[in-house]
């Protein structure tokens, strides 16, 4: 009787440790993955809200991408963005339709995106 209880206890401890490790580890994604591209494009609105530059930035490409399962999905992205000729604050302005201002340098951003669609949550943080 003693042996099965010990065995089950050991299995429980191992499974909890393994589950925690899976939950806390990050997975590397291909930068061209469709999901990653969609998240990066959607994140640009909040990136533009958080920058001090007077014009909008436009996503050029995703440089690197990792994900982590938390209470939702956390995306760790490094993106390259280019300044555009479109001013911030213009009603209905879509940076994807703006012209890149080639006289200004591109900028690399490291961002964290927390997405929990069932809670209607999509939060972007510049790091």
From Swiss-Prot:
GO cellular component: cytoplasm; extracellular space; vesicle
Gene: cpi-1
Entry function: Cysteine protease inhibitor which inhibits members of the peptidase C1 family. Does not inhibit asparaginyl endopeptidase.
Name assigned to this protein: Cystatin cpi-1
PANTHER family on file: CYSTATIN (PTHR46186:SF2)
A GO term, aspect molecular function: cysteine-type endopeptidase inhibitor activity
UniProt keyword Disulfide bond present: yes
Signal peptide range: 1-19
Cystines in this chain: 86-98
């Amino acid at each position: 009787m003693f042996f099965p209880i010990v065995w089950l206890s050991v299995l429980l401890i191992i499974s909890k440790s393994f589950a925690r490790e899976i939950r806390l580890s990050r997975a590397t994604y291909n930068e061209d993955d469709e999901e990653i591209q969609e998240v990066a494009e959607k994140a640009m609105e909040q990136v533009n809200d958080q920058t001090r530059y007077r014009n909008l930035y436009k996503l050029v490409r995703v440089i690197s991408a990792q994900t982590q399962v938390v209470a939702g999905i956390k995306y760790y992205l490094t993106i390259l963005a280019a300044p555009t000729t479109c001013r911030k604050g213009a009603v209905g302005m879509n940076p994807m339709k703006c012209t890149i201002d080639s006289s200004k340098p591109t900028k690399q951003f490291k961002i964290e995106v927390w997405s929990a669609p069932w809670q209607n949550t999509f939060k972007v943080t510049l790091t």
